[in-house]
A protein has these predicted regions:
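C-terminal motif of bacterial Sec signal peptides marking the signal peptidase cleavage site
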Residues: 16-19
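Bacterial signal peptide processing site
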Residues: 21-24
C-alpha cells in the first residue's frame, strides 16, 4: 500500500491506456449493431480478435527476474457460510526491482487456476513459463510492472468431478475481497490506501482478475458478485454458471441479461469495466464461452466492444501451455507501459 499521492501518474496512465494497445491482429466479426463503430477506446475494431504468438525467447529465463513469495492466510468457510475458520495459500509475484523502487505503486492481477491444479501451479507449470513471460514483458517495456497473485478455490481435498467445484468457485471472490486482497494490498505497494470495502472500491481501476477453465467460472462469478472491486475480467475457456452449471452455454441469452442487470445496478463501477474473454480454436470449452460472449454482445448498452472482446488463439487446446499467448496479448492491454516515471515523459511513440 502506497501512502503518498500518485495523482499525476494515475491520470497519465489512464490517458494513455488506449494508445499503447496495438499488438493484436484482428479480423472482423462485428455484430450488425456495432458496424457504425469505426474506432473504439478499447483499441480492438471487432468483437472477435486473433491473438499474436509469443516470441520463443519470452518463455526462457530472463536476465532480470522477479520473485515469488508464498502467503498463508486465515479465511473462512464461505461455501457453507457457517463462519468456520480455515486457512488458504496464495503465491505473489513481485516484479524485478520491486525492492529498490520504494516510491512506486503497482497494479495487481489475481489469477485462479483450473481443475486439478493449485495456487502454486501458475508459477511452476511448464518450467516456470508464466513467470518467465512476466519477466520478459516487464523487462522489455511491453507492460508496466505489476504484482500477480495466484489464488485457489480448493477446500481441503479437491473434488473428483470438476463441475462439483462450482460452489467453491462461487465463494472465492468473496474470500478475495474479505481476506486476501486486504492482506496483499496492505503488505505490498499498491494503489490501495485503505483496505476496508470503500478503500478497495476506490482502487478497483488498478485491479484485475482472471482464470482458466474452472478459474474462468470463478472470474464470471467475480463479475457478478464483486464488480465493484475489479475493473478487468479475463475468463479463459469457460462460460459463466450464475444460472446453473454450463448455463452460459445452455442459456446464453438469460445469462447475458442477468450479467447486464448486475452491471446496470452497480453502485460504483458504472460502465468502467472490461471483459477480455478468450479461448483456443481446438479448446473443448471454446463453444461454451464463445456462445455466451456472442449473446452478451447483443446487449449493446452494456457489452459493446469498449467493454467486451473475445480473443481466439489458433489451434490452442484446453491445456496450461496455451495460457502464455493469452497473457502475452492481454496484460499489455490492461497494464500498458506508457509512462516513464523517472523521466516523467511518455514513452509510447504513438502518442
Amino acid at each position: 500500500m502506497c501512502t503518498f499521492s500518485m495523482t499525476i501518474k494515475t491520470f497519465l496512465l489512464c490517458l494513455c491506456l488506449t494508445a499503447c494497445n496495438g499488438n493484436e491482429e484482428v479480423y472482423s466479426t462485428t455484430l450488425p449493431e456495432q458496424e457504425t463503430e469505426a474506432e473504439t477506446s478499447s483499441g480492438y475494431p471487432s468483437l472477435l480478435n486473433k491473438t499474436v504468438p509469443v516470441p520463443a525467447e519470452y518463455l526462457e529465463e530472463a536476465a532480470s527476474q522477479g520473485s515469488v513469495v508464498q502467503i498463508d492466510y486465515d479465511t473462512r468457510n464461505y461455501v457453507d457460510g457457517n463462519g468456520e475458520m480455515r486457512s488458504n495459500t496464495a503465491y505473489v509475484y513481485l516484479p524485478y526491482g520491486y525492492e529498490e523502487s520504494s516510491d512506486e505503486c503497482y497494479d495487481v492481477f489475481y489469477f485462479v487456476h483450473g481443475h486439478g491444479e493449485t495456487a502454486a501451479s501458475f508459477f511452476q507449470n511448464e518450467n516456470g513459463m508464466m513467470r518467465n513471460l512476466l519477466d520478459h514483458l516487464i523487462a522489455n517495456g511491453d507492460m508496466s510492472p505489476i504484482i500477480v497473485v495466484s489464488t485457489s478455490y480448493v477446500y481441503g481435498t479437491p473434488v473428483d468431478y470438476y463441475p462439483d467445484a462450482d460452489p467453491y468457485c462461487k465463494a472465492l471472490p468473496q474470500e478475495l475481497v474479505n481476506d486476501l486482497i486486504p492482506l496483499v494490498e496492505s503488505r505490498y505497494r499498491t494503489y490501495t490506501q485503505q483496505t476496508d470495502f470503500e478503500g478497495l472500491q476506490a482502487s478497483r481501476n488498478h485491479r484485475a482478475i482472471g482464470g482458466f477453465s474452472m478459474g474462468a467460472v470463478t472470474t464470471w462469478y467475480a463479475l457478478e458478485c464483486t464488480l465493484d472491486y475489479f475493473k478487468y475480467f479475463m475468463p479463459i475457456s469457460s462460460d459463466g454458471w450464475s444460472l446453473g452449471r454450463f448455463a452460459g452455454m445452455d442459456y446464453p441469452d438469460e445469462t447475458a441479461a442477468h450479467l447486464a442487470d448486475i452491471i446496470r445496478s452497480s453502485s460504483s463501477s458504472g460502465n468502467d469495466f472490461y471483459i477480455w474473454a478468450c479461448s483456443g480454436t481446438d479448446d473443448v470449452a471454446y463453444d461454451r464461452i464463445w456462445i455466451q460472449v456472442q449473446a452478451m454482445a447483443q446487449i449493446t448498452d452494456v457489452f459493446d466492444i469498449n467493454h467486451l472482446t473475445f480473443h481466439e488463439q489458433e489451434s490452442a487446446r484446453h491445456v496450461f501451455g496455451s495460457l502464455s499467448e493469452y497473457f502475452f496479448n492481454a496484460l499489455p492491454f490492461m497494464f500498458p507501459d506508457c509512462y516513464d516515471v523517472n523521466s516523467q515523459q511518455f514513452t509510447n511513440d504513438n502518442l
